[in-house]
């Protein structure tokens, strides 16, 4: 039988775990430390660690202010948690009541597309980036209460058309739910090509 950790040990490990992965849920922490969710919440309160939503918001705001050039914060669908311009980006989107069809609690597809598309725009290292073309695929329906993690990767910065190719894969947990390939127009191309997309 495994010996239970003392409160002090548990809180130190909890703090370290959240510092390593600020997006871990209270439920996952409770399972990891074999305590109730309420115990995790009390530990977080004692340690002055904010709830998951506030931790995500803090990281998203910090990343956006430091890195995103092409979109204002309020125009991004989902919250950007990691970004390296012209390389990769990650965002989280919580599916709420206003995002689903009332009769079946399934997320409307345009929300998943908007998360992926705004992430593809945000990852571009330009003041202006527009979607010229996209190819998307919905793999399975996303439901109310699920958290969608979109991961964008820049595949080709300047292809033969002078466009940037961004691939986005969206997951719920480990399960792939959406994929998209976005051909992005960059503002640096505007002066070279005139105003055609």
Curated annotation (Swiss-Prot):
The keyword Lipid biosynthesis applies. One of its GO terms (biological process) is negative regulation of fatty acid biosynthetic process. Keywords: DNA-binding, Fatty acid biosynthesis, Fatty acid metabolism, Lipid biosynthesis, Lipid metabolism, Repressor, Transcription, Transcription regulation. CDD domains: hot_dog. InterPro entries: HotDog_dom_sf, Thioestr_dom, Transcription_factor_FapR, WH-like_DNA-bd_sf, WH_DNA-bd_sf. GO terms for molecular function: DNA binding; DNA-binding transcription factor activity. The keyword Lipid biosynthesis applies. Belongs to the FapR family. Transcriptional factor involved in regulation of membrane lipid biosynthesis by repressing genes involved in fatty acid and phospholipid metabolism. This is Transcription factor FapR. It comes from Bacillus cytotoxicus (strain DSM 22905 / CIP 110041 / 391-98 / NVH 391-98). The lineage of its organism: Bacteria, Bacillati, Bacillota, Bacilli, Bacillales. The gene is fapR.
């Amino acid at each position: 039988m495994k010996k239970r950790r003392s409160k002090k040990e548990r809180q130190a490990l909890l703090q370290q775990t959240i510092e390593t992965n600020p997006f871990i849920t209270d439920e996952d922490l409770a399972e990891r430390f074999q305590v109730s969710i309420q115990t995790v919440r009390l530990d977080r309160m004692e340690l002055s660690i904010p709830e998951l939503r506030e931790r995500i918001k803090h990281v998203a705001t910090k990343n956006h202010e430091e890195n995103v050039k092409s979109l204002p914060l309020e125009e991004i669908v989902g919250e950007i948690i990691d970004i390296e311009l012209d390389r990769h980006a990650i965002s989280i989107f919580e599916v709420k009541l206003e995002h689903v069809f009332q009769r079946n609690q399934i997320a409307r597809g345009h929300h998943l597309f908007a998360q992926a598309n705004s992430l593809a725009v945000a990852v571009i290292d330009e003041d202006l980036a527009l979607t010229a073309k996209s190819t998307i695929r919905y793999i399975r329906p996303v439901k109310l209460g699920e958290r969608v993690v979109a991961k964008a990767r820049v595949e080709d910065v300047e292809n033969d058309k002078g466009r940037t190719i961004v691939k986005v894969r969206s997951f719920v947990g480990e399960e792939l739910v959406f994929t998209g390939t976005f051909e992005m127009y960059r503002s640096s191309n505007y002066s070279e090509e005139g105003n055609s997309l």
